[in-house]
Regions:
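Terminal RNA-binding accessory module
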Residues: 1, 6, 376-470
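Contiguous mid-protein beta-loop-alpha structural module that forms a pocket-lining wall or clamp
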Residues: 343, 350, 358-360
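Short glycine-enriched, charge-decorated loop/helix-capping segments at active-site entrances
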Residues: 80-81, 202-203, 242-245, 305-312, ...
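Short flexible coil/turn linkers enriched for glycine and charged/polar residues
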Residues: 176-179, 189-191, 288, 298, ...
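Conserved SAM/AdoMet-binding glycine-rich loop
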Residues: 105-110, 117-119, 221-345, 356
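Proteins enriched for Cys/Gly/acidic motifs involved in redox and nucleic-acid/cofactor modification
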Residues: 1-238, 277, 314-325, 353-357, ...
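Conserved, mostly hydrophobic/aromatic
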Residues: 193, 213, 230, 266, ...
Length: 470
């Protein structure tokens, strides 16, 4: 089932910008520039959302600062994927009690995926009276109104009602980087994996119109952006709720044909919807990075079925093998869950054998049990924690050896890399496949592509020498 996607009207957005003007006027009467701090937890989509929050704050006249201490506004943009992350948020939220005691006029807001959980908003309402507002991801576009309501003396704000199907275009953004950019192409997820809470807190899949995405990408490229990452909980489902007939491969091809010197990449891909058409498109266009994050989660078909992943081991391997055939230089990464409820030792060994077969450049492993809420939390889970930790350690050892082997294969090769910063006395850069490279160089190289010859490698990164530096 696809939710009908609606776009927030210009009149509704104008009302939000009017609230920005009211907030700015409020601070003008105070005779000083207000400050704001945004703390982001979790995934790249949350990072993109925080850029929009900072955009609204800038429109309201706030200067962005790097600490909650003394800030006039504090926003905690939260993640609900792991229970540990939620507990960390509550701990930090509690610590803000002392910050607000020192600065009584400070306004504190909680947003993001946690805010979409009724139990979280209820807990904040009753146990964290110093928090001035809670709003879910569906209400991010209404933040100026929420902020103005608080500043003008209205009661605590709770914008948490489920509002699926809405997309807001034209929200200002203050991006973290001028070189790299996140571009959200869709929101929500329809897959309902049994361990995942995302569909419950971010809603069903909603795709942005292709012309809006293309316009955003063109503006970024014209402004000097060199690396664009397209974001979605499942980018491969893009367009299924639109009437234009454009799927994700079509969108990717259209972006790759925009004039300019840049790369486009994407995350996250669900194997269920990854197609040969997508892989052929990636192979065809040089501006599409030959990097693919394709989470397999388990090497056991039985466990995959219990996860409600909609594919089996054989299907996953067929797709990966085709992708590697048409893109021999492809850099593959993945997520994997260790100790899913009911996973046997034999099924864990199937995961190990898949890792050894595919040869991922890196993995992002997680230990089950799943967080409370999704169906997997209620499954029988007889495997002791110590055994799960043992499996986790073994998996990491296997993957670390593979990562080091892959990185060692780069030694002696010259790779085109985007130089993105400095780490102490070395510059840092990223290969087309997303590998970290450190090398000696000049600051004027930052923001440019450089040909770097790899001279050394570790499990986690590469070292090299720029071609134009002897």
């Amino acid at each position: 089932m696809n939710t009908k996607t609606t776009v927030i009207s210009q009149a509704e957005l104008d009302a939000q910008f009017a609230c920005c003007d009211k907030v700015a006027a409020y601070w003008q009467t105070k005779g000083r520039t207000p400050t704001a701090y945004v703390e982001t937890y979790g995934c790249q989509q949350n990072e993109a959302d925080s850029e929009k929050l900072r955009g609204f704050l800038a429109q309201c006249g706030y200067a962005i600062v790097g600490s909650a201490e003394g800030a006039d506004v504090v926003i905690m943009n939260t993640c609900a994927i792991r229970e540990h992350a939620e507990q960390r948020v509550f701990g930090n939220l509690g610590a803000l009690t002392h910050t607000k005691r020192r600065h009584p006029e400070q306004k504190i807001f909680l947003c993001g995926c946690m805010a979409g959980e009724t139990k979280v908003s209820d807990r904040v309402r009753h146990s964290y009276p110093h928090v001035d507002g809670v709003f879910s991801t569906h209400h991010l576009w209404q933040f100026p109104q929420i902020l103005w309501n608080v500043l003008s003396g209205k009661k605590r704000q709770f914008f948490i009602e489920d509002e699926p199907g809405s997309i807001a275009e034209g929200i200002p953004q203050v991006r973290d980087s001028s070189l790299k950019a996140w571009v959200s192409i869709m929101y929500g997820c329809n897959n309902f994996c049994t361990y995942c809470i995302v569909p419950y807190v971010r809603g069903r899949e909603r795709s942005r119109q292709p012309e809006d995405i293309l316009a955003e990408c063109r503006a970024l490229i014209e402004g000097g952006t060199k690396d664009i990452t397209l974001l979605g909980q499942n980018v491969n489902s893009y367009g299924k709720d639109l009437s234009c007939g454009m799927d994700f491969a079509d969108l990717l091809a259209a972006i790759a044909q925009i004039p300019g010197d840049f790369l486009v990449r994407f995350m996250t891909s669900h194997p269920r919807d990854a197609s040969e058409k997508l892989f052929d498109t990636m192979a065809r266009y040089p501006k599409i990075a030959k990097q693919l994050h394709l989470p397999f989660q388990s090497g056991s078909s039985r466990v995959l079925k219990a996860m409600n992943r909609h594919y089996d081991r054989e299907t996953y391997l067929q797709k990966v093998n085709y992708a590697k055939k048409v893109m021999p230089e492809l850099v593959l990464t993945s997520d994997v869950i260790v100790g899913f409820p009911g996973e046997t030792e034999e099924e864990f060994e199937e995961t190990i054998s898949l890792i050894q077969s595919v040869h991922y450049a890196s993995l992002f492993p997680f230990i089950s049990p799943p967080r409370p809420g999704p169906p997997a939390a209620k499954m029988d889970d007889p495997t002791p924690k110590d055994e799960k930790n043992r499996r986790f350690d073994r998996l990491c050892a296997v993957q670390n050896a593979i990562s080091e082997e892959i990185h060692n294969s780069y030694i002696g090769k010259t790779l085109r890399c985007l130089v993105d910063g400095r780490d102490k006395d070395l510059l840092t850069a990223r290969t087309e496949g997303g590998r970290l490279v450190r090398f000696p160089g000049r600051d004027d190289m930052i923001g440019t592509y450089q040909n770097i010859t790899i001279t050394a490698a570790t499990t986690w990164s590469l070292s090299g020498k720029a071609a134009d530096i002897c």
